[in-house]
């Protein structure tokens, strides 16, 4: 079972201003306690070096550390888990490789994707999107919007599917209240944090919105 940390996830991204490590550090300083290292097309050795640094940072903050796509790397460094896209290793195969103690998340874009995934495996959470257009993702799937999430959540309830659904893709702070009202269990962010004038403050403000009862400490 995954922790309440999954309600707010940060996905690393490289920009002209910030390295992958910078982005993870700022998210952690802002109070986020779930970091997914996403380094598409990166050199394997560079990704491992980066993962080890960010994993140590996550441990210092008591945060969950997820590796995107790279199952063997997640196992090698004993990350908390792995997130798998629709074209990555099948979840069932990853579960065999990692065992039951690792968190495994899967990408879906529709309720049909959820049903197809559950035919062969049960992930710990679904990353579902995109909510809006996002420049951080290539080959973007059809945009869901609020109504798309409402429909998926309704269908999941009707089928008694109780797996956390995390909204992702172009999410900014102003959209969060209505997104949560749509029924998603959490959100994942990247660009909206990194494009802010003060990324740490932006994350801090969102953490306060998501976890009103939790005091944020550095």
Regions found by a protein language model. Name each.
Residues 137-139:
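A short acidic, glycine-rich active-site loop
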Residues 34-38, 127-135, 187-190:
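Short beta-strands and strand-loop turn motifs
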Residues 1-89, 97-124, 141, 147, ...:
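Conserved N-terminal beta1-alpha1 strand-loop-helix module at the mouth
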